[in-house]
Each structure stands twice: as C-alpha cells, then as structure tokens.
Amino acid sequence: MGFHLITQLKGMSVVLVLLPTLLLVMLTGAQRACPKNCRCDGKIVYCESHAFADIPENISGGSQGLSLRFNSIQKLKSNQFAGLNQLIWLYLDHNYISSVDEDAFQGIRRLKELILSSNKITYLHNKTFHPVPNLRNLDLSYNKLQTLQSEQFKGLRKLIILHLRSNSLKTVPIRVFQDCRNLDFLDLGYNRLRSLSRNAFAGLLKLKELHLEHNQFSKINFAHFPRLFNLRSIYLQWNRIRSISQGLTWTWSSLHNLDLSGNDIQGIEPGTFKCLPNLQKLNLDSNKLTNISQETVNAWISLISITLSGNMWECSRSICPLFYWLKNFKGNKESTMICAGPKHIQGEKVSDAVETYNICSEVQVVNTERSHLVPQTPQKPLIIPRPTIFKPDVTQSTFETPSPSPGFQIPGAEQEYEHVSFHKIIAGSVALFLSVAMILLVIYVSWKRYPASMKQLQQHSLMKRRRKKARESERQMNSPLQEYYVDYKPTNSETMDISVNGSGPCTYTISGSRECEMPHHMKPLPYYSYDQPVIGYCQAHQPLHVTKGYETVSPEQDESPGLELGRDHSFIATIARSAAPAIYLERIAN
C-alpha cells in the first residue's frame, strides 16, 4: 500500500511540473497571434495593401519588423507604437499620412529604420524624431514638407542615410545637421532650394554623397561646403546655375565626381578647379559654354571621364585649348561636340571643323613666326610654308604685324569655296538611296495589291500613245493636200457684159498653185462640165450653175475621145500637181 502511495505522489509531482510549462507555451502562442488580414513571418508582420485606416490590433510586442505599406492611414497618433518596444524597422510609406504627432514614436527606442516616403506630410514638429536616437535610415522623400525645424534631426548621431527628395523645401536651416556626425548619404534633390547658407552642412564630417539636383540654384560657391573632407560626389545637375566660383582657402582633395549638367553656365572662372586636384568625373553637358580657358584645362589633371556635349561652342581660336586637351585626353569623353558659331560652320563637329578649316593650326604658325621674328640676316626674309594656298602678300603682312588680331581669318581655299564634309556626302547618298528604294517599294506593293488597276493604267497609257501617233499620221497626210476652189467675183458691169455680149473676165484660183484669167468668146450662154470633182466644189457652186444655165455633162459626152484643148475653142484644162486627181473643164456646144 505504501508502494502505491509513493507512485501516486510521484505522478502528481510530474503533473505539477508540466502544468506551468504548458501554460507558458499557451500564453506565448496567444501573444504571437497574427492580426487579421496580415501575414506573419516569425517576428516580422506584414500588413500591406489592405486599406488599413489605423494600426492593426493584436500585433505581437516582440515583433521586430512591421510593414504597413500601401494602406489608408491618415494620421499617426501619440504613443501609436508604444507596445512594440522591440521594433527595429517600420515601413509606413505609400499611405495618406498628413499629420504626425510629436510623440508618435515614443516607446520604440530601438528603431533603426523608419520609412515615411510617399505620404502627404507638410509639417514635422521639432521633437518628432527625438524618441528614436538609434535611427540609421530615415526616408521622408516624396512628401510636401515646406520647412525643416532647426532641431529637426537633433540627437540622431547614428543616422547614416537621410532622404528628403521631392518635397517643397525652399531653405536649409543653419546647422540643421549638426548632430548627424555619421551621415554618409544626403538627398535634397527635386526641391525648391534657391540658395545655401555657408554653414548649412556644418557637422557632416563623414558625408560622402550629396544630391542637390533639380533645384533652383542660380550660382554655386564651393565655399558653401565647408570642411566636407570626405565628400566624394556632389550632384548639381538641372538647376539654373550661371556661374561657379570656388572661394576656398583649402584644397578639396576628396571630391571625385562633380555633375553640373543641364544648367546655364556660360563661362568658368580660370581658377575654379584649382582646389579640386583629385576630380575624376566631370559632367558639363547641356550648358551654354562657348569655350574653356587654358588655365581651366590645366587644372584637370586627374580626370578620367568628361562630358561636354550640348553646349554652344564657338569654333574660333578660343576653342583651341580645349581641342588640344581633348586630343591628348585618354579617358572617357563625349565626342558629339557641335559648333554653334561662326555661322558658316554651324552644325559641324568641333573636331572636324578645327581640322577642316585649320582653326588651330594658324595659332601654331603665329607662335612659330613670333619665335623667329628676330632673324640674324634681315636681308633674307623668313618664309614659312603653309599647308593651304600660299600667298606672298599675306606672308609679308604677317611679318609686318607679328600679333594678329583675334578676328584674323586664315587665307586659303576655305575662303574661295565652301568645304563639303565627307559625312555629308555619305548622308546625302544614303538619303537618295532610301528615297529610290521607297518609291520602288510603293510601286511593287501597288502592283501586287492592285494588279487590275495597274493593267488599266498601262492600257490607258498605251491607248494614249496610239491616239497621239494616229493624230501625227493624220496631220502628215493632210499637210500636202492643197485646197482647190473656183473664185468667181464678177462686178455688176461684168455681169451685164456676160449676159449681153457673152464675154467677160473669169478668174480661177487654185490655192497653192496659180491664178489665171481668160476671156470668153461665146455665143449664147456657155455650159461647163467638171470632170471628177474632188472635194465637192462643183456641188458647192450648184446655185451658180442653175442661175447661169450651167449643167453637168452627160456620161456619153464625158466619154468622147480626142479631147483637144485650145484657145480657139475656148477650153480650159487645169491639172493639179498634188495628191488630188486632175480637173478638166470643158465647153459644151449647144
């Protein structure tokens, strides 16, 4: 019996030991319950894209990561995340947050990454980020911030990355980043900044990359970036910068990349780059530069990449320092530099224009002439051969004036004729070839797609040619034919003579032949017959025949042989010498 009692006591002790363990496991499981419409992965909670208007409840206090992206949260209240003291990162981007309480981040001191981008935040209190001194990454980009408070980032000594991109900031307060000693990356691009105070970036001793692109700066002085000994890259592209000055009393040896593209820079002061001896990459494209001085290119001793396209290069002798520097430059360079002037070489590549028009060779010739201006034998003038057409008058004038004016033009073939570049010939040939190919293609497609129309067109053109040939042949047949007619124009007195006396002048006219006049000695009214009328002229004179008593000869009379013509019998015979048949006129006796 005692043995059974001991066994029961041992069983009870085991149950008492296991019961607290089970309760602890159950409590832990309840504590780690995942909120509705969320996804939990260990200590990471994802409540994304479910239109949450507030922070979900029942989030485990031991969660280390919380993502509330793409929801409809509009406001962050005081102590909103107080129960989540183990949070390391918090994503609140792509919401509609417009108001943030200054105590919204109380209780999450361990937070290292806070993303508030793509919201509608217009204002942040001075102490908003004081409860999170361990922040490494703070993203406030793509909001509507208009100002930064003077102590906005106070105490953020561990901050490494700060995004303020695409807001509406107009100024940067003095020493606003004073406590951000470890800041490595600062993005202030796409704002409305017009100027920078001298101490705006004071305290950023470890800053390596600074973005100021797409703002409204009109001038830049390197003195506005004091003692940024570790800054390697600065981006100032697409502002309104017209001038650059250095104003530094120290050497900025850490800067490697400088982007000034897309501005309105018209000129660079000669000593601007002297304080940047280690500059490796320089972007000056899409500005309004016309030339670069010799002193400036001499300061580019460490460059390995440069872009200069999209400027208004003046292809005169002022471009020569840059041309020779680029010719000897072995790094990565932009080769599409186009001349904006003078007018006769606009659109040419700078390198082609300089070599074609000998723009810089003249400068070398002038220097050579200067070195020989003091000859030992003045009786023998020094003659320097030129690669272009030699003109003694020009050479002589060069010796008389050893310092030519800047507007001096090179005498040579370029003044007599305009040079045609080889690439223009190639481009024209290609354009002509493409035009012919396009025409042939259109004809081929039309022939394949509409064969009946093409056949009709060919038949129409063939018929047109046939008609034209028929007209020409008809014109050739009609041209030798002559018009024959009898012109009888009696006056009143002659009519009376003919009717009374039976005689009078009669005029017969053959067009293109001859005109004859013959008197008639007839008795009573004579009768005439026309043999083989040609064009119906006898029919045309039928009324005259009826009036005067003329009648057509009978066939029996027409066949009478031995027709004799003579003045005694008053017969007239006219034979046409053309393609028309002969006409015989015969007097018939009553």
UniProtKB/Swiss-Prot annotation:
Bilayer disposition of the protein: Single-pass type I membrane protein
Primary localization class, coarse: membrane
Glycosylation (residues): 58, 126, 291
Membrane side Cytoplasmic: residue ranges: 446-590
TM segment ranges: 425-445
Leader peptide range in chain numbering: 1-30
Gene3D superfamilies: Ribonuclease Inhibitor
Pfam family, one: LRR_8
Repeat region (LRR), residues: 62-83, 86-107, 110-131, 134-155, 158-179, 182-203, 206-226, 230-251, 254-275, 278-299
Name of the featured protein: Leucine-rich repeat transmembrane neuronal protein 4
Organism of this sequence: Homo sapiens
Taxon lineage: Eukaryota, Metazoa, Chordata, Craniata, Vertebrata
